[in-house]
Regions:
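Start-of-helix register in tetratricopeptide repeats
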Residues: 23, 57, 91, 125-129, ...
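Residue-level recognition of tetratricopeptide repeat
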Residues: 30, 64, 98, 139, ...
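Canonical tetratricopeptide repeat
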Residues: 61, 95, 129, 133-136, ...
Length: 353
């Protein structure tokens, strides 16, 4: 009995000795870490890790010490150990996930962050790190989603959490446009502009297009005016603004000026020459419109059914009816669904509205 008691005392003494030594090493390691003596901290925590093999805090601070010392591989290895030992810890998982990102292991980082969000870590939703993790998850899911609507949903969830990069707003607004959600285009473009005023040269052109599609002509014109104030040579704006004015038969003098500037900078672009021709057509300057249209048709890649129909209209106004019908027939060949063109051919004239 006496031998057993002696053995137990010796065993407990050894245990308390190890515990005391571990506690002392932890204090020394933390002291070195706080003093930013990361080399010393690494030595201490490495020694401690050999004794406390199941203590996640040891590997966590060892990883942070390696990270501060710019030894990313060792930092990642120890952060993973801390995370595996305590998968419910937000801090351990966050460090591991960030190191995975630094190592471009994006899928593993996504899985790590998704697991963190699944745990009840008693974190507030508005904490910066929580927001950052959620935004990464939503952005990753958005990038992976195959359906445009799903992409848009995830990107918006990321944006609604707080400030995001300008690039994300561009993606959201472009998806709104592709999904034909013009009201959403306006809403999100204005929100992006409020958060990032320097996005004005990109936002105002798409606002002009969206307002025009929604039938808000005055807002469209105002947006295009602001776009040109930000970038007077924006060819997209010069083209769309002048074309929209021409089909509305409004501010034709402005449309004339804008389209002239456009083709001066892009003298061989068929689409832009077509816009110029149509402005001239609405101004009843038919000989000039014909010259512009024939130049547009030399751009074979952009010689669309629309261009051929417009060319036919110009020729008709010049009383070249047979040539007009030939042009309309070419338009119908390129796009057989154009009932308006078929009607022009059958009537041998442009129907009056």
């Amino acid at each position: 009995m006496m031998k057993k008691l002696t053995y137990l005392i010796l065993l407990l003494g050894g245990f308390f000795s190890v515990a005391a030594q571990s506690e002392e090493l932890m204090v020394d390691g933390m002291r070195a870490y706080m003093k930013e003596d990361f080399g010393e901290a690494i030595l201490v925590f490495e020694k401690l890790a050999k004794v406390q093999t199941q203590e996640p805090a040891v590997f966590y601070y060892l990883a942070k010490s390696y990270l501060a010392d710019k030894q990313l591989t060792s930092a990642r290895t120890n952060a993973e150990k801390a995370h595996l030992l305590s998968p419910y810890s937000f801090d351990y998982g966050l460090l591991y996930g960030d190191l995975l990102l630094a190592n471009k292991e994006y899928k593993k980082a996504l899985a790590c962050f998704e697991n963190l969000l699944a745990y009840d870590d008693h974190r507030f939703d508005n904490e910066p790190d929580m927001i950052r993790v959620k935004q990464f998850v939503f952005l990753s899911k958005g990038d992976e989603a195959k359906e445009l609507a799903d992409k848009n949903k995830y990107y918006l969830q990321a944006a609604n959490l707080g400030p995001v990069q300008e690039e994300l707003w561009v993606r959201i607004i472009q998806l709104d446009w592709e999904l034909n959600r013009k009201e959403a285009v306006v809403e999100h473009a204005l929100e992006a502009l409020e958060n990032y005023p320097r996005m004005a040269p990109w936002v105002f052109p798409i606002l002009g297009d969206a307002y025009q599609a929604l039938g808000n002509n005055s807002a469209s014109d105002a947006a295009f005016d602001k776009a040109l104030a930000a970038n007077p040579k924006d060819d997209h704006v010069l083209n769309n603004y002048s074309y929209f004015l021409s089909i509305r038969k409004e501010k034709l003098a402005l449309a004339d000026s804008l389209s002239a500037r456009l083709v001066a900078d892009h003298p061989k672009n068929g689409t832009y020459l077509d816009t110029r021709a149509w402005v001239l057509f609405e101004l009843k300057r038919y000989p000039e419109a014909r010259i512009a249209m024939e130049a547009a048709l030399k751009d074979k890649e952009n010689a669309s059914a629309t261009l051929w129909e417009h060319y036919g209209d110009v020729l008709f106004r010049l009383h070249l009816v047979d040539k007009a019908i030939e042009a309309w027939k070419e338009a119908l060949r390129l796009d057989p669904s154009r009932e308006s063109v078929d009607k022009k051919i059958r009537m041998r004239q442009i129907p009056e509205n």
